[in-house]
Regions:
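Non-catalytic, mobile gating and regulatory segments of ester bond hydrolases
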Residues: 19-156, 160-284
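Fungal secretory targeting signals
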Residues: 1-23
Length: 284
């Protein structure tokens, strides 16, 4: 949710504070070994903001994602170093993105290759942008699997990109059930109801939520009034390997749920040792 319209962001922050009142418990444990993969995810997420072409760190880009109507942006590629096929989603940089961030009207998703339970609902601000690119993403990943059949799959993104990663993970898991899949959604807000979280959390593969200290975005839409639900495993860090912890459940007070922050705060712009927009593309 990187955006330069300060007054709108302050407004969202105030709304989110009014809507967020979680019940918290603390059970986090040290998880330094998780930091390198989350650091790499942050590098790729930062690269998505930079409009990289050709390469983004270890990923060779094969297709840019850019849907003008919905503002959806990112890239798809592969890493010979990691033997991964990668779907990387960009966070917010425009008014269109910001409108997606706050469009919490619940809708029933419908995507090719995905069978949703009838009670699953997700926010329109995620359903609409992902639906615009879903078929393109699946087609490109399918093409790359044909070229690199032994590669695993990954989805990565920060902020709005992290929220889109939440649905990308399900789309990839359902369309390619025989492929190993790991997704890292950084600084993401929850996107759907409890039925959605239960369904998404039941998919094959690994879904991680990576959050930075003093970031309030993961706490958005998690109240009795809106009450969207996260899924997956949360990791929390102040930017160093030594500070990285694995959180227990979705509302561990030693992690983002207990930091007292809501919506866009100063901690939102850093992630696992990377300041968003500053990492470049990693390689010339």
């Amino acid at each position: 949710m990187l955006f330069n319209c300060q007054s709108l962001l302050v407004g969202i922050s105030l709304i989110s504070q009014a809507l967020s009142a979680p019940i918290l418990e603390s059970r986090a444990t040290a998880a330094a070994s998780a930091f390198p993969d989350l650091h790499r995810a942050a590098q790729l997420s930062s690269a998505a903001y930079s409009g990289c072409r050709g390469n983004a760190f270890d990923v060779t880009i094969t297709k840019r994602i850019n849907d003008l109507l919905t503002g959806t942006d990112g890239f798809i590629g592969y890493s010979t170093e990691k033997k991964k096929i990668s779907v990387i989603m960009r966070g917010s940089t425009s008014i269109v993105d910001l409108l997606n961030d706050i469009d919490i009207h619940l809708v029933t998703p419908s995507l090719s290759g995905v069978t949703f339970p009838p009670d699953v609902k997700i926010m329109r601000g995620i359903n609409r942008p992902w639906s615009a690119i879903h078929d393109t993403v699946i087609a490109e990943v399918k093409s790359l699997i044909a070229k690199y059949p032994d590669y695993t799959l990954e989805a990565v993104g920060h902020s709005l990109g992290g929220a889109l990663t939440s649905i990308a993970h399900v789309a990839l898991a359902q369309n390619f059930p025989d492929k190993e899949l790991t997704s890292n959604a950084l600084a993401a807000f929850p996107i759907g109801n409890e039925a959605w979280a239960n369904f998404a959390g039941s998919q094959p593969g690994t879904f991680n939520r990576g959050n930075n200290v003093l970031d309030g975005v993961p706490n958005m839409y998690s109240s009795g009034l809106v009450n969207f639900k996260h899924y997956g495993t949360e990791y929390y860090s102040s930017g160093s390997e030594a500070s990285c912890v694995k959180c227990e459940g979705q509302r561990d007070r030693a992690c983002s749920a207990g930091n007292g922050m809501y919506a866009v705060t100063i901690g939102h712009f850093s992630s696992f040792g990377i300041t968003m927009l500053t990492a470049g593309c990693g390689r010339l």
